[in-house]
Amino acid sequence: MHTPPDTGMAGKPFRATYIWTNIINNLQTQVEVKRRRHNLKIYPDCFLGSEAVDVVLAHIIQSKVCGDAEVPRFKAVRLCQALMEARVFEAVDTKVFGKEKRQAKFEDSSCSLYRFLNRQTPSTSGSETIGSGYNTQRNTNSPPFQRMEDSAYSNNSPVKTDKSLEDVLGNLNMNTTITPQMMNLGLSQELMDEIWRQQTVLRLLQLIELPLLESLLEGQESPRPPLHSMDSDPDLLYTSSYLDREILKAFSEAQADSWLSAAVDCQEFLPDQLVVDVSRGLAKCEEETSQYKQLLYGVLVQHYGQSDYPPLLTNHVFDIHSGVSELLVNGKCEQALESLQLCLKLQDSRSREELRRLLRFMALAGSPHQIKLHKEIENRMAVKRAFSNAIVYGTKLAKGKVDLLVLFMMDKHHDLFKIPVTLHKLVSDKLASIIKGTDPDRITGTTYCRHLSGKEFVETVQKTTREELWTLLKTIHENTKLSLKEKRRLLGQFYKGHPEIFVQYFGNRISNIYI
């Protein structure tokens, strides 16, 4: 007999190519490409590794590429590695102490830069991205960035790789069937933004018990002023403060020190007068790194140490910060990290970026191997003391909890600005319910109650009661602080009320129990 052909494999190369192309197109249109500063130098038309993973993961989940299966973040990282090997994008050449260094392995990090190959990339002079991968505005009038030496890749043709597309997608356990969801979600950007916000709030309510919801659902603080840059205001080119900012950038590029680079990055958020003071102060310093660092650190402390400085974690979600600190006190670090990630998704992009830069600087400056910042306390405590008021609203929060929260954010600053996988899943389920025409207000994701029949309710009550009584009897029996007389009295009372459980607990030892 002849074995019939596997009809499920028919057309698989086409489906795999289609999925692959959609992932690439989505990454190119959704990831934030702009001029970035890294290791003392500015690189044009780049995107962050962590943001690429966010975009790819969101596309995989929302498009149901893997069906309803949970997609861990490491699979999106693996797919980004395959995209880099396929020459869709490359790691940006960075100079570390004068030597060219190119990453051979894709890194899910906010410090790793990548650049698309053979793609018209808008400059960031007119671009602004809010969120990570789902709210993007771009200017298409900028000159394109092209790489002439790489011509193997094209959006309209299969990618030439050492591995077949089927192997790449198969290793990720992806479903290669084209679905209507993958073709076109048909949803407006406004609706998408609202869905992301709703599901972010929903997930926060699952992690943290909030006494009041009005501030979270309705309260919005006015966004902070934009960065001081020629991109947002061309007239700045003719001001002295703009020249001072450019002097600081040039100074940073000339120094082989990540501490100085992180400090100068924070200067972009400072008012003009402080920037002018820093620029002129550097000119008066001797050519010693320690003097440069003392000057930059002092100016940052002066700016962020103001008593009336508005904290970067917005006050209208103070209850979230209080809840996160409680999670940390109880040792629930994973839930605390996810709660902070969700909280940051509710903030404006400007505050989020300023906080990211400040935490990066604090982590570098807080190292014991860096320049001593305070005569009596270690660097880690010095930066915590100097910048805590600029991060979280500490008037109503106990000082110990504020310190714990700030130090935790310093330690986790690399992961703090990533999108949790659970949020991706909630958004995916919500989109699926809308596309299928089911109730859009139906709660998706994890639920904590279900309808029980009368019989199930009785069985649950009996089981729970038995378990609690067993625990109570065990506590009485094993409590070494009770006197023998008191223990006999309590055991006697328990035996009179629940003899069956008493006999089951002691078994053959019941003859040795004096009650």
From Swiss-Prot:
Name any Gene Ontology BP term.
intracellular signal transduction
Q: Which parts of the sequence are annotated with region: Disordered? A: 121-160
Q: Which gene encodes it?
A: depdc7
The name this protein carries in UniProt is: DEP domain-containing protein 7
Which SUPFAM superfamilies does the UniProt entry name for this protein? Winged helix' DNA-binding domain (SSF46785)
Ranked from the top, the taxonomy reads: Eukaryota, Metazoa, Chordata, Craniata, Vertebrata
Q: Which Gene3D superfamilies match?
A: Winged helix-like DNA-binding domain superfamily/Winged helix DNA-binding domain
Which residues are in the DEP domain? 27-118
What the entry lists under InterPro entries is as follows: DEP_dom (IPR000591), WH-like_DNA-bd_sf (IPR036388), WH_DNA-bd_sf (IPR036390)
The UniProt entry, under Pfam families, shows: DEP
Organism whose genome encodes this protein: Danio rerio
Bias type Polar residues, positions = 121-144
Family label: Belongs to the DEPDC7 family.
